[in-house]
Amino acid sequence: LDVVDRWRNEREAGTRLTFAIHAGGTTVGGAELQPRGETAELAWWLYAGHRGSGHATRAARLLVEHAFSDLGVRRVEAKVDPRNVSSQRVATRSGLRREGVRRLEPGMAERDDATGMVVYARLISDPPISEPEGFRALLNSFLPRKRAISQLLVRDHDGRVLICRLTYKRDWDLPGGVVEVGESPQLAASREVQEELALDLLAGPLLLTDWLPPWGGWDDAVCLVFDGGAHDAGIADQIRKQAREIREAEFATLEQVRERCADFTARRIESALSNAESGGGPAYVESGG
């Protein structure tokens, strides 16, 4: 009842604009806009038996244009339950770009069991989705994105591999890190090694692509291992550790790698090392191989 009273008061005050969706001579659903300054929140619903025919998409498109042209807002947004796949399609087809997921505690949304809402929005300055630039930007907002990690396989002339003990986990790993948005993975490997170890090493050819399944709170990722070349063991004396991330760094035998690294990391190092020594093309493995 409190919700109904609030909606009634908002309608009377003009802060909640409700519209009926008509099709084929009957009312098939509704939609509403809630202007708040330069932003308006958009919502829609369809009655059973009238879904899947494009009615909600057309209504949403019309209300977005109405908000921009008649209400003076500069941003229209919609919050959609991530379990509601059809409403997510409506948001996308009406030209709203996916911006992210707003996390919620149970009881904070209209459905008490919702733990998040997907935020979609369109700005008045966004190119129309009828234009190539606008359509590409729309697709780019919701298509899957996969994290990329670049690492460098650095060896000495005895076949040992440079590994690091990190501050944020117990096991050792190859030097490297997450590729920044828009950054070349090959350049990222060299950048990370310079930042973490103060070594200026060029990343050579790709040795291994390793898909990492979700693990320990991380989403899945792709790890790219590049050839860092073979060097004199004395290069380790030039290392200046980035204390925030690196505890130790040293050359290790394969036996030491197996003892110090997680099993999948050890498998990845062995796969990359085998490929570097054989001179074969880059290999693909999953969880180290």
Per-region residue spans from a language model:
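A short, internal acetyl-CoA/4′-phosphopantetheine-binding micro-motif in the GNAT/acyltransferase core
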Residues: 20-22, 43-56, 80-81, 178-181
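Conserved catalytic-core motifs of GNAT/GCN5-like acyltransferases
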Residues: 79, 95-117
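Conserved Nudix-box catalytic region and its N-terminal flanking loop in Nudix hydrolases
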Residues: 81, 156-195
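Acidic, metal-coordinating catalytic segment for phosphate/diphosphate chemistry
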Residues: 119-153
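Unchanged
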Residues: 179-202, 210-265
